[in-house]
């Protein structure tokens, strides 16, 4: 008969053995994905290309385009946005129309629509990895696999690069949201400053709410109605000559304080209303954004502004949940080329400084090359700029030839001339270096 001491020792040993087995257990095997089906290609896809469509095991729709003369390179694309509401199967068609240059260069293209609408970065990263596996399992085995994230899709791509480090051999980020949640702080600043100046979102006769939630879940406000309110207060829908002096003054205050052009006011106000509402809904009804302690500058009476502007406190748990879903640590195991327009008013170029700092702090600074374009465009800078970026990243991956901003600029011009196009189509600025994000977005 065993003594209690021996029984306890045996139980402890058994528990340790079970824990050891669980510790050594393999990660769950992903579900088997159905093969995609051949479908007609969207308009604009190069002649001879083959298009495949399907819906993955998590219900995300996707599109795969295989060029007639395949380079052996697969580019998995993470699209921008995010688009609020249910995902549209046509989203991938829109993406390939914009990024058909990828296929024209001979590379296969695969893009997921993402199964969740709105701000769901981790699940979008999972969908991105899933479409890569579908390509490998059912279409072809690429010699190289690159991950391309555009705009908000760069947030998805950085997440996917850290979640699935063995899936990618290089990462290209264009116009990317690469500074994490801090990228969006100024959208709450926009809401607070707008309400201070206009007091019509919400109106005094409407139920009040914390602006940090974007919009109450039961609100019926539409984008058109919001635009009408902004036009009443700021004259954003009118030529400058038709604005009242008071409208012009308010609009100038927003531009001076928040440091973006008047043409971007509505997009940022929309984000701070509808997209922020989606963020809050996905974070349990509380907001990860706040402006307590922010010191606003840029007016003739900054003290008066800071005393009067509405203030809101971020919920700590929402902050943690939001960061866990959308943020990266700069721990990328492969070469990263990140490119941004200097005057991008949608996603500020200063976020690139945060990317550099994070990768350096993580010990991966040597895996980053950044290039900058003399443009104010966010979505697409013109065909001249992208072939050289794919070429530079592939040369780095395959030959160990790390590109330089100057080399990218020079090679862009060479490729343009070789194609019989004017070299002036290239707008890279080799010696540009972005300032810290805190010089553009008020720190908190």
What is each stretch, according to the model?
Residues 346-351:
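Conserved alpha/beta-hydrolase "acid-adjacent" motif
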Residues 69-70, 131-151, 167:
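Gly/Ser-rich "nucleophile elbow"/oxyanion-hole loop immediately N-terminal to the catalytic nucleophile
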Residues 30-42, 177-327:
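Accessory cap/linker subdomain of secreted extracellular hydrolases
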Residues 46, 231-274, 278-291, 333-334, ...:
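Alpha/beta-hydrolase-fold serine-hydrolase catalytic core, especially in secreted/extracellular enzymes
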Residues 144-199:
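Primarily recognizes the serine-hydrolase "nucleophile elbow" in alpha/beta-hydrolase
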Residues 21-23:
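C-terminal motif of bacterial Sec signal peptides marking the signal peptidase cleavage site
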Residues 72-81:
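Short beta-strand element of the alpha/beta-hydrolase
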Residues 338-340:
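Short beta-strand/loop motif that positions the catalytic acidic residue
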């Amino acid at each position: 008969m065993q003594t209690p001491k021996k029984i306890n020792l045996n139980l402890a040993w058994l528990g340790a053995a079970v824990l050891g087995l669980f510790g050594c257990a393999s990660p769950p095997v992903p579900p088997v994905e159905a093969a995609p089906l051949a479908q007609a290609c969207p308009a604009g896809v190069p002649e001879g290309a083959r298009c495949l469509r399907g819906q993955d095991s998590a219900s995300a729709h996707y599109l795969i385009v295989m060029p007639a003369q395949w380079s052996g390179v697969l580019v998995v694309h993470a699209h921008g946005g995010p688009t609020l509401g249910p995902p549209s199967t046509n989203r991938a068609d829109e993406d390939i129309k914009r990024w058909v240059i990828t296929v024209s260069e001979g590379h296969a293209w695969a893009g997921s629509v993402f199964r969740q609408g709105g701000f769901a970065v981790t699940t979008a990263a999972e969908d991105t990895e899933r479409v890569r596996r579908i390509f490998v399992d059912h279409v072809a085995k690429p010699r190289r696999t690159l991950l391309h994230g555009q705009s908000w899709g760069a947030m998805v791509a950085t997440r996917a690069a850290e979640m699935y480090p063995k899936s990618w051999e290089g990462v290209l980020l264009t116009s990317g949201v690469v500074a994490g949640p801090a990228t969006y702080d100024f959208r709450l600043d926009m809401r607070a400053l707008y309400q201070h100046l206009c007091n019509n979102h919400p109106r005094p006769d409407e139920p009040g709410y914390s602006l940090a939630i974007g919009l109450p879940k039961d609100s019926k406000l539409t984008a058109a109605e919001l635009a009408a309110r902004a036009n009443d207060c700021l004259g954003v829908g009118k030529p400058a000559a038709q604005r009242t002096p008071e409208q012009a003054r308010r609009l100038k205050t927003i531009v001076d304080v928040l440091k973006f052009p008047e043409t971007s006011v509505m997009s940022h106000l929309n984000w701070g209303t509808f997209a922020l509402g989606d963020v809050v809904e996905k974070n349990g009804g509380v907001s990860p954004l706040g402006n307590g302690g922010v010191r606003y500058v840029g007016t003739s009476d900054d003290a008066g502004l800071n005393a009067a502007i509405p203030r809101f406190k971020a919920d700590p748990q929402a902050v943690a949940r939001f960061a866990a879903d959308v943020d990266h640590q700069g721990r990328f195991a492969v070469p990263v080329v990140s490119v941004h327009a200097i005057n991008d008013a949608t996603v500020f170029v200063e976020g690139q400084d945060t990317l550099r700092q994070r990768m350096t702090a993580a010990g991966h600074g040597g895996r980053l090359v950044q290039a900058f374009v003399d443009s104010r465009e966010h979505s697409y800078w013109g065909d001249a700029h992208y072939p050289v970026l794919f070429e530079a990243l592939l040369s780095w991956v395959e030959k160990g030839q790390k590109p330089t901003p100057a080399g990218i600029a020079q090679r862009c011009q060479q490729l343009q001339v070789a194609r019989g196009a004017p070299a002036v189509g290239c707008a890279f600025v080799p010696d540009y270096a972005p300032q810290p994000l805190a010089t553009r977005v008020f720190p908190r």
